[in-house]
Amino acid sequence: MSRVAKAPVTIPAGVEVTLNGQEIAVKGKNGTLKRILNAAVIVTKEENVLKFAPQEGVTGADAQAGTARALVNNMVIGVTTGFERKLVLVGVGYRAQAKGKSVGLALGFSHPIDHELPEGVTAECPTQTEIVLKSADKAMLGQVAADIRAYRSPEPYKGKGVRYSDEVVRTKEAKKK
């Protein structure tokens, strides 16, 4: 059995977990998250604890049990505290502006970029070169951050572009004559 799957997920007060076959719904102060888990995983709920076990005789069930446990744990954390991802814009004239359900970006192209945010993800810009994305769904948050970064990923010579706040960009040395 997976080491990750052996650890049970504790359900904190104020969080409601509903199991319906292979579908799990986690409801908390930050909203409701639903996910369909792999059929090779057996989920049992005992008071305020969720336990995960692989189905016997199914190839890859151990790995799927660990994955399901990690996904459900992220759902519980998401509906209680939420997740956030910070992006930093490095470069002359690179600007960001939060506009309700979208983020306006000026990244040196001939046109401004207006990136629509999916339902459940919010953005704020403390400064013109910083974007803070917040969501209860960790996977969706990571995907939105990656989509915004993909518009202008950091280049290796000057490091200009959109990067994660904790990302270290290794710069190359310029060509010598």
UniProtKB/Swiss-Prot annotation:
Coiled-coil ranges from the UniProt annotation: none
Swiss-Prot/TrEMBL GO biological process terms: cytoplasmic translation
Alphabetical keyword list: Ribonucleoprotein, Ribosomal protein, RNA-binding, rRNA-binding
A molecular-function term among this protein's GO annotations: rRNA binding
PROSITE patterns: RIBOSOMAL_L6_1
InterPro entries: Ribosomal_uL6-like (IPR000702), Ribosomal_uL6-like_a/b-dom_sf (IPR036789), Ribosomal_uL6_a/b-dom (IPR020040), Ribosomal_uL6_bac-type (IPR019906), Ribosomal_uL6_CS (IPR002358)
Keyword field contains Methyltransferase: no
GO CC term (a single one): cytosolic large ribosomal subunit
Family annotation (Gene3D superfamilies): Ribosomal protein L6, alpha-beta domain
Keyword RNA-binding in annotation: yes
SUPFAM superfamilies (UniProt xref): Ribosomal protein L6
Domain of life of the organism encoding this protein: Bacteria
Physiological role: This protein binds to the 23S rRNA, and is important in its secondary structure. It is located near the subunit interface in the base of the L7/L12 stalk, and near the tRNA binding site of the peptidyltransferase center.
Subunit structure: Part of the 50S ribosomal subunit.
Family per record: Belongs to the universal ribosomal protein uL6 family.
Protein name: Large ribosomal subunit protein uL6
Gene name of the record: rplF
